[in-house]
Amino acid sequence: MGDVEKGKKILIMKCSQCHTVEKGGKHKTGPNHHGLFGRKTGQAPGYSYTAANKNKGITWGEDTLMEYLENPKKYIPGTKMIFVGIKKKEERADLIAYLKKATNE
């Protein structure tokens, strides 16, 4: 897949202002992502999602994250996530590799 260390840097630069990944991490503007892989959209306990996120009905995995992270508002119209996305496929792969590791520790 991608490079975990590069993915960690991407998360710190582009995601950590709004998200945490560690077990027991607090929700910020966006939800904590611990346990993300295999979870359906809009299901992180204790986070208030839009109906669009709750109703999307997909399960997060490498393929769904690859598409979502390219353009979140296109993938889930009505999401409150303001991030424009990551256009470079390699950067998305690196981030997903890190998320897969960090959200399961």
Swiss-Prot record:
Annotated protein name in UniProt: Cytochrome c
Role according to the record: Electron carrier protein. The oxidized form of the cytochrome c heme group can accept an electron from the heme group of the cytochrome c1 subunit of cytochrome reductase. Cytochrome c then transfers this electron to the cytochrome oxidase complex, the final protein carrier in the mitochondrial electron-transport chain.
Record keywords, A-Z: Acetylation, Apoptosis, Electron transport, Heme, Iron, Metal-binding, Mitochondrion, Phosphoprotein, Respiratory chain, Transport
GO terms under cellular component: cytosol; mitochondrial intermembrane space
Molecular function terms, GO-annotated: electron transfer activity; heme binding; metal ion binding
Organism per entry: Trachypithecus cristatus
Gene: CYCS
Record carries keyword Oxidoreductase: no
Residues with the N6-succinyllysine modification: 56, 73
Annotated binding of heme c, by residue: 15, 18-19, 81
Modified residues (N-acetylglycine): 2
In-chain residues carrying the UniProt-annotated modification Phosphotyrosine: 49, 98
InterPro entries: Cyt_c-like_dom, Cyt_c-like_dom_sf, Cyt_c_1A/1B
Positions of post-translational N6-acetyllysine modification: 73, 100
